[in-house]
Amino acid sequence: GTHSLQDSIMLREFASPHWRDQYLEPLVQGEIFPSFGMTEPDVASSDPTQLQTTAILDNGTWKINGTKWFTTGAARAAYTTVMCRTELDAPSHGAFSMIIVPTDNPGYKIVRETPVLGINGGHYEVKYDNVEVPEENLLGPRGQGFIIAQKRLGPGRIFHCMRWLGQAQRAFDLLCERMHERETFGTPLTKKQLLQKFVFDSACEIQASRHLTLDAAKRIDQGDDARIEIGLIKVVGAEMLHNVIDRAIQVHGAKGLTDDTPLSLMYRHAREARIYDGPDEVHVQSVARRILKNYENNGPGWDFGERDASLVS
């Protein structure tokens, strides 16, 4: 799934040979599952520079203390990659590192599962109580946690958008099929202009999101970090998914609210998409700031085509 793909990219680039040998091949083969610990209950997720979990290096051993939550898949994972504050005197983004913690480690304690919108989706609150791991469990250099996180989250957001496109296609099919099945006042739903607008808007939004996603993926493949393109698709893709499913539910009427179709479950998952991996508001602000920077001091502006790699992204 998405998390395994994200972790395989991260391990390949940043893990020591020992941990690549230990986890990378089993991960790719689907024999083990990963988890990722970044979000904390007492800190706003939109400002991760305030994370409080610490890792202190003492005689070649990291000692980790803190609490994470929304650690997806923690109960079945072989390991968790944990974002920890390791450079206690360093400024903001340079204060954090990524450390691998095997989930069978003493002190790694699952506190509870955290259902989301009534769904038990495998998210957990995890406490790190004097967890000790070797120094070699560090991913990449010290103080590079945010760089590594971005390397993981960037492609991961593209994977999410690809999945959302598949879900939107399913909802679109259900919407159109329902319009052919039902009639009101002697007229099929396919003849209702208002509902035809549902079809038109959904088709436009799905296709626009599809092309935005393909563009972001292409730029990643070309070595661009694609920060702007990824921010765009994270917001536009999540909104598209919500809108298409919402219209499909509306066409199904009360049936769309029941478990007789997959739409009610899809709708709840769609609402999550505007929050996880960064809330919409953070991506909107980040994208706008990066684009505007290209116009400072009579700068080159922003090219929507095959832009110069020197433009800020």
List each language-model region with its residue ranges.
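N-terminal glycine-rich flavin-associated loop
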Residues: 1-18, 47, 56
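Alpha-helical interface subdomain recognition
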Residues: 14-19, 26, 30, 57-62, ...
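A short, Trp-centered hydrophobic/proline-enriched beta-strand micro-motif
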Residues: 30-39
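Conserved hydrophobic/aromatic beta-strand scaffold that supports enzyme active sites
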Residues: 35, 52-54, 79-83, 98-100, ...
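Hydrophobic, small-residue-rich alpha-helical packing segments that form membrane-like cores
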Residues: 38-51, 57-62, 71, 101
